[in-house]
Amino acid sequence: MKAESVSQWILVILFATLLFFAFTGIFVSTLLVVLTPEGFAFLLGFLGALVFANKLLFGYGSFVITAEAFLTNKEIDRRELAKKTNEPVERTENLSIPALLALWLAGLDYYRYAYYGIFTLMLIIMLLSKFDLLGALTIGNYFEGAFWGAAVITLFVFALEITANYLMARINEEVSLNG
């Protein structure tokens, strides 16, 4: 029993040491990448998209948590849910929880359209610069770096959007089956 405990502690210490070396290596390599102009453009594109997609990331994330709570029959505060729809109280006071969830999801569409519109504009500018229509030798690499930085955040937004729409479809199916 004692040898088991000692071996477990040795493995935990070894794992912590490996994690430390991995994270310091990632940190150093990240610093080296940012020293290049393309890496800096990637970082700026990543941070800019993160700021712009903040409402979508937290909105879809909160929606997914609330929808999963509804599907597992956990208690959901109707007043808090009505606040998240950004609708007047008079309009939401007689609505069911699935209807409030649908309103909440529909309220995120404006931000989604704006975000995907800006991302598409970044894609067009990047492609124009890479096809040498804007001068690929001067600014093409910077636009490409910013685009790929924004693409990382867009992947998360897209994944959360798909998950939220899937959960809303499951809620609609459950409500229609239960009548």
Curated annotation (Swiss-Prot):
TM segment ranges: 9-31, 41-63, 114-136, 146-168
Signal peptide bounds: none
GO cellular component: plasma membrane
Top-level taxon in the UniProt lineage: Bacteria
Keywords: Cell membrane, Membrane, Transmembrane, Transmembrane helix
Membrane topology category: Multi-pass membrane protein
Keyword Transmembrane helix set for record: yes
Subcellular location: Cell membrane
Identification of the protein by name: Uncharacterized protein aq_757
Organism in which the protein naturally occurs: Aquifex aeolicus (strain VF5)
